[in-house]
Amino acid sequence: MATLGELERAIMEILWASPQSRSAYDLQELLADRKLAATTILTVLSRLENKGFVVRSRDARPHRYTAAASREEHMADLMHEVLGGATDRTAVLERFVGQVSAEEAATLRKLLG
């Protein structure tokens, strides 16, 4: 799975939190403290689209963008990728389970049946 750079993550956080699609100009306004050019945001959005993180709506002008998957789906994919890359999956799972709270452990038990 492709990783996110710092600006990519900032844009994705906005898209994940937004109930509606966003244009590059919307994102520029929401990230005004960074003083980014619209072209910079468009470049980042293009990269995110190429990586499969965003979907561009071509029927509106300016184009509007939405997250291709929820934040939770993205995080689950990352967890699965990490586990898949382990040479000793059991050791990784043991370490993970050893670090979860009692409430999270109960949730895991419930989900596993």
Task: Tell where the protein language model's regions lie, with residue ranges.
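Short, cationic-aromatic polyanion-contact patches
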Residues: 4-7, 59-78
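Pre-recognition alpha-helix immediately N-terminal to the DNA-recognition helix
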Residues: 9-14, 26
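Short helix-capping/hinge SLiMs at alpha-helix to coil transitions
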Residues: 15-21, 69
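Short acidic, hydrophobic short linear motifs in intrinsically disordered regions
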Residues: 21-30
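Short, hydrophobic-biased segments on the C-terminal half of alpha helices
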Residues: 42-46
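A short, conserved structural fragment
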Residues: 49-59
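Amphipathic alpha-helical dimerization/coiled-coil segments
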Residues: 77-113
